[in-house]
Amino acid sequence: MKTTILILLILGLGINAKSLEERKSEEEKAFKLLGRIIHHVGNFVYGFSHVFGDDQQDNGKFYGHYAEDNGKHWYDTGDQ
């Protein structure tokens, strides 16, 4: 009787361990998807900020060019 209970207990723990592994893999897939979404949103924000001249390193500067310039330079935001 004790042996039967022990065997059933071991089998039950094995089934629970398998379901935990399956849940873990589903969670990993969800976290990977969430990571990809965050990465793409970050890329969008980065590109959006550069299109409109915002600099992440120095918020007091504007990256652009005036008509008389033949290249892009850093200007103070007061010069615009």
UniProtKB/Swiss-Prot annotation:
Domain of life: Eukaryota
Signal sequence, start to end: 1-19
Keyword field contains Signal: yes
Keyword Protease: no
Assigned keywords, A-Z: Amidation, Antibiotic, Antimicrobial, Secreted, Signal
Transmembrane segments: none
Modified residues (Phenylalanine amide): 52
Major location category of this protein: secreted
GO cellular component labels: extracellular region
Pfam family, one: Clavanin
Localization per record: Secreted
Coiled coil: none
Entry comment describing in which tissues the protein is expressed: Hemocytes and pharyngeal tissues.
Alphabetical GO biological process terms: defense response to bacterium
Biological role: Has antimicrobial activity against E.coli, L.monocytogenes and C.albicans.
Protein name, as recorded: Clavanin-D
